[in-house]
Amino acid sequence: MNRRQVLAALAAIPLLPEAFPANAQAPQKPAAFDPSVVRQIARQLASKPYQAPDTKLPSALADLDYDAYRAIRFNPERALWRGDQLPFQVQFFHRGLFYKNAVTIYEVANGKAQQIRYRSDDFSFGATPAPPPDADLGFAGFRIHAPINKPDYYDEVSVFLGATYFRAVAKGQHYGLSARGLSIDTGQSGGEEFPLFTAFWLERPAPEASSMVVHALLDSKSVAGAYRFTIRPGDTTVFDVEMALYPRADLEHAGLSPMTSMFFFGPNDPSDAADFRPEVHDSDGLAIFNGRGEQLWRPLANPRDLQISAFADLNPRGIGLMQRERQFQAYQDLESRFGLRPSLWAEPIGDWGEGVVQLIEIPTKEEVHDNIAAFWTPKTPLKAKGEHIYTYRLHWGPDTPKPSSLARFSRTGISVRGDHRLFVLDITGDILKSVDAGAVRGVVSADKGEIRNVVTQPNPETGGWRLSFDLTPETPAAELRASLWGGDKALSEVWVYRWTL
C-alpha cells in the first residue's frame, strides 16, 4: 500500500476523526495516539482488499546503482531530537535502489502523533540531481543512534529499512544478520510473500530513558499487523516485540520471529575457491532450547542444493542464529570483522504452542547474499479474520542471554577419508574442567549410514574435549546427532547435523 492509503486508513478510524489527513501537502495538527491505535488501523486494513504500494520515483532516483544510492546521505545535524539532550536520535533513509516503497513516519510526544515531513534539503545527493524543494517523496526507513560505546557520541544501534527487515548491534559490535517482522511461505515451492512495514510511530524518549519505543504497521496481500518494539541498547541490545496479526487469508506457512543471515564457508564446509580467510559467515549455527529442555546446536552449511530442516517442538524456550566463533584468527578479515557480528536469540514470552523451527540453507557463490533463514511456524494455520497475538524478546549480542552450564560445541570439522567422512567436534565449557576423564563418553547416532570409531579425548589447546567419529554413508544425506556424557549425566548440548554429498 502507498502512503495515501495508509493515511486514508488512519483517517477512517473513529477514534481519530481528523487525524492524519490524506492530503499529504496540507499542514497537519498533532493527532491523538495510544498503543491501541496501530492495532485498530491494522484491523481496519485487514477488512479490505490489499492494495499494492505505489513505488514510482523520479527517474534520477529510480535507476540508481549501489554506489549512487550510498552517496545519498542524511544530514546528521537534522536528526530527530538532535540538540534536545535526549538519549536517542533518529536519522532517515532516502528512497531509491532496492528501497522504493515509501514509509510514513510519525513522532509521538505527549500522547500526540505528528508526521515527520520529508524535505530534500535534509539530504546530500552526491552526483544525483536533488529533488525539487516541494517534492514529497517520503522516506525508505530510519536508523536509531544512541551513546552505546562512548557517552559523548551517538553510534548507530539499529536500522529499519526494506520490507519488514531490521537489525541491531550491541556495544562494540558491527552489523551482521537481520530480523524481519514476519515471513510468509519462505521456502515454499510457490514463492515467498514479502510483507511491508508501511508506517512507523517513534515515541519521544524521556531525558533519562534507557529505551525507545517504535510502533509499526505491517501490510501485505495476506495479512495486516501491528507491532510495538521496545529497544534497549547495551552490552546486549534487547528488543521487546509485541505483535498482533490480522490475516486476510489463512496463513499456513507464517514465519514468526524470522531471522536471515549469511554462511559462505567454515571448517565444516570449506570454500572450493582459494581464499586467504579460513571462515566467512555472519552466523555459524542455529541454537534451539526446546520445550522439552533439550539444547540443540546445528552448525550451518552452504549446501549444493536447497536444504530445509524442521525441528518439531511444543512451546520453545529460545531460538537463535548464533556467531560462536569470536577469534580474529578464525577469519583473518580486517575489513569485515566477522568475529564482531552479533548473535540473535529470540525468546518467546508465553506459550507458543505446537509448531516447528524451520531452518533454510540456500546455496550461494558469493558472501554478499543472505542464504540462511530461521523462524518458528505454528502447527495450526493463522486463521483469516482473527487476531493472533505473539510476544517475544530479541537479544542482539555476543551470546544467549542465559548461557547454559552444559558444554558447547565450538567447532565442527569434516574430512573426506576414502569411502567415509571423519567428523572432529571440539567441545568447551567449565563443566568439563572437573569431569572424571575415565567416565567421559561420546554418544553418536545417524539415521542412515554406519557410525564407527567414536573417540573422546581431552583437548589441551582449548581446555575442553574432542569427540571424533567416522560416518560411512549409505545415501546422499544423513541426519547425525552427537553429545558428550559423563556416566549417566549429559555434559554437553546436543549437536545435530545434516550431512550431504
From Swiss-Prot:
Signal peptide range in chain numbering: 1-24
MF-aspect GO terms = carbohydrate binding; catalytic activity
Alphabetically sorted, this entry's keywords are:
Periplasm, Signal
The entry's cellular-component GO terms read: outer membrane-bounded periplasmic space
**InterPro entries recorded:** Gal_mutarotase_sf_dom, GH-type_carb-bd, Glucan_biosyn_MdoG/MdoD, Glucan_biosyn_MdoG_C, Ig-like_fold, Ig_E-set, MdoG_OpgG
Q: Which Pfam families match?
A: MdoG
Q: Where in the cell is it found?
A: Periplasm
Origin superkingdom: Bacteria
Pathway assigned in UniProt: Glycan metabolism; osmoregulated periplasmic glucan (OPG) biosynthesis
Name the record gives this protein: Glucans biosynthesis protein G
The answer to whether the entry has keyword Transmembrane helix is no
Q: Which gene encodes it?
A: opgG
- Primary role: Involved in the biosynthesis of osmoregulated periplasmic glucans (OPGs).
| Lineage of source species | Bacteria, Pseudomonadati, Pseudomonadota, Alphaproteobacteria, Hyphomicrobiales
Q: Which GO biological process entries does UniProt record here? A: beta-glucan biosynthetic process
- UniProt family annotation: Belongs to the OpgD/OpgG family.
